[in-house]
Amino acid sequence: MTNIRKSHPLIKIVNESFIDLPTPSNISAWWNFGSLLGICLILQILTGLFLAMHYTSDTTTAFSSVTHICRDVNYGWIIRYMHANGASMFFICLFMHAGRGMYYGSYTFSETWNIGILLLFTVMATAFMGYVLPWGQMSFWGATVITNLLSAIPYIGTNLVEWIWGGFSVDKATLTRFFAFHFILPFIILALAIIHLLFLHETGSNNPSGMTSDTDKIPFHPYYTIKDILGLLLLILMLMLLVLFSPDLLGDPDNYTPANPLNTPPHIKPEWYFLFAYAILRSIPNKLGGVLALILSILILAVVPLLHTSKQRGMMFRPISQCLFWLLVADLLTLTWIGGQPVEHPFITIGQLASIMYFSIILILMPISGIIENHLLKW
């Protein structure tokens, strides 16, 4: 009799995706982040579901309902902080996962890569709308500033912003629809993640060497299930250290003040994981130009496969490209720091230089380094 995991229509899909999946024998810990992202997503959906049971999406009671969750609901505080800090963990894993894709040339799987970019946009939209829900000062003003950027679109901009707001300012209608979207989007993300995996399993995984590994595959279980569990334990350790010891470390103190349309906070800034894009947005004095730069800062990932000039897939044996890659990482950290600073003299210039650097490395320097390294191979 055939084993049930190989014959049952449903279990067979799970078996081919997580048990008998042929996997390269040499993939490193950088390949752990995909499974960690899946776990983060499930964690966010579950904690979010329990929060939604007690949350009210009304401007008069939203702030109070979040306070009620933290004070009166059984273990409400831990659910709320796991959800808030879980988002930070989600983005750390996302950046690591995308960075690994860039470093090892995984972007040559163009369908998987493009679905990944779409996933990144969707997760960013979800996180932004989630940040609005507690209805604190930074929630309200963050929503006002970011949605207002759409008014830079010629001709239809103003109408578009008012349509999204559901009125002439960020108010009850905005909060209600943001809650609805914030609830539905994670399930769309889940569907996209399944498509992402579907495309990946068409080609099989890449590996650190960038060479084909068809001759050297091992089953996913038990080798990589054990490896993923180790990654999961480290993720949970980091998350719980944050949640239990300094839950507000990554948040903004202004969000503990109820939203007040008559009082603007001195520095309006998004959560830390958007600061790099926010810095790029602010570095351009023109409103429409800034919005375009903001969108392009993520959309630029779509042209990375087109700009691949090297004969080698990954950067494992390409020292010049490696230097540029780590320069790009340092540049993104600089942009993240600048995004959290006030718009004053040294920070403006640093932000502009870092923004130019960001686009230059990806669009100009990386392709040139690939060509140079091709010539070095002939020596």
Swiss-Prot record:
Transmembrane residue ranges: 33-53, 77-98, 113-133, 178-198, 226-246, 288-308, 320-340, 347-367
Matches recorded under Pfam families: Cytochrom_B_C, Cytochrome_B
GO process annotations (BP): mitochondrial electron transport, ubiquinol to cytochrome c
Annotated heme b b566 binding sites: 97, 196
GO cellular component, one term: mitochondrial inner membrane
Obligatory cofactor(s): heme b
PROSITE patterns recorded: CYTB_CTER, CYTB_NTER
Keyword Transmembrane helix listed: yes
Keywords on record: Electron transport, Heme, Iron, Membrane, Metal-binding, Mitochondrion, Mitochondrion inner membrane, Respiratory chain, Transmembrane, Transmembrane helix, Transport, Ubiquinone
Residue numbers binding a ubiquinone: 201
Membrane topology of the entry: Multi-pass membrane protein
Keyword Electron transport: yes
Primary location recorded for the protein, binned into one broad class: mitochondrion
Record GO terms (molecular function): metal ion binding; ubiquinol-cytochrome-c reductase activity
Record function comment: Component of the ubiquinol-cytochrome c reductase complex (complex III or cytochrome b-c1 complex) that is part of the mitochondrial respiratory chain. The b-c1 complex mediates electron transfer from ubiquinol to cytochrome c. Contributes to the generation of a proton gradient across the mitochondrial membrane that is then used for ATP synthesis.
Subunit structure: The cytochrome bc1 complex contains 11 subunits: 3 respiratory subunits (MT-CYB, CYC1 and UQCRFS1), 2 core proteins (UQCRC1 and UQCRC2) and 6 low-molecular weight proteins (UQCRH/QCR6, UQCRB/QCR7, UQCRQ/QCR8, UQCR10/QCR9, UQCR11/QCR10 and a cleavage product of UQCRFS1). This cytochrome bc1 complex then forms a dimer.
UniProt name for this protein: Cytochrome b
